[in-house]
Amino acid sequence: MNQTLLSSFGTAFERVEHALDALREGRGVMVLDDEDRENEGDMIFAAETMTVEQMALTIRHGSGIVCLCLTEERRKQLDLPMMVENNTSAYGTGFTVTIEAAEGVTTGVSAADRVTTVRAAIADGAKPSDLNRPGHVFPLRAQPGGVLTRGGHTEATIDLVTLAGFKPAGVLCELTNDDGTMARAPECIKFAQQHNMAVVTIEDLVAYRREHERKAS
């Protein structure tokens, strides 16, 4: 990642800390991966605190594929089958079947309905019957070990919300440009600044976690 673009957001460790602070304050975070991977920026929010307004922003400026990042434990709790048995996608993204809240929604498409679905899926006592399948929210299963196991936006989301003190569940969506193309780092950073989001890279988070685990050992 071009460090010049990121310099105004501090060092790698400062960027992670700023991201955690943003989540604790109920704000979003722009998570960038490497140029030689997807080369994309994802807007992420803690599932517990995401507002209808934030969901609307995500739908308006994102790819439209609003994803709910979950742990394997939560996936099993909700009895969500993986979308395919043999995942042949380029980066092995862990999509499950799509979901909709069983109660409290209309068509499931609106920002309010999608937030209702997210809330239903992450509730402490959530059970499979609380969700209909298919739906308009796309759960993603994170790999155990987070970004130290797989350097994806899914794992970064779970790591960040967990480090910030929330349940291990977060919402993400890729940022797109107005013409429908994928936003790259310069556009992602500009968008984050306009919408009071922190900016962090997956590389930052890997370094941060490794250092903290080294100190703890």
UniProtKB/Swiss-Prot annotation:
Q: Name one GO molecular function term.
A: manganese ion binding
Keywords in UniProt for this one? Lyase, Magnesium, Manganese, Metal-binding, Riboflavin biosynthesis
Listed cofactors: Mg(2+); Mn(2+)
Q: Which domain of life is it from?
A: Bacteria
EC number(s) per UniProt? 4.1.99.12
| Metabolic or biological pathway, per its Swiss-Prot or TrEMBL entry | Cofactor biosynthesis; riboflavin biosynthesis; 2-hydroxy-3-oxobutyl phosphate from D-ribulose 5-phosphate: step 1/1
Q: Name one GO biological process term.
A: riboflavin biosynthetic process
The UniProt note on the cofactor reads as follows: Binds 2 divalent metal cations per subunit. Magnesium or manganese.
Name of a matching Pfam family: DHBP_synthase
Annotated binding of Mg(2+) 1, by residue: 38
Assembly and partners?
Homodimer.
Q: Which family does the entry's similarity section mention?
A: Belongs to the DHBP synthase family.
* Protein name as annotated: 3,4-dihydroxy-2-butanone 4-phosphate synthase
Which species does the entry assign this protein to?
Klebsiella pneumoniae subsp. pneumoniae (strain ATCC 700721 / MGH 78578)
Traced from the root, the source organism's taxonomic lineage reads:
Bacteria, Pseudomonadati, Pseudomonadota, Gammaproteobacteria, Enterobacterales
* Name of the coding gene: ribB
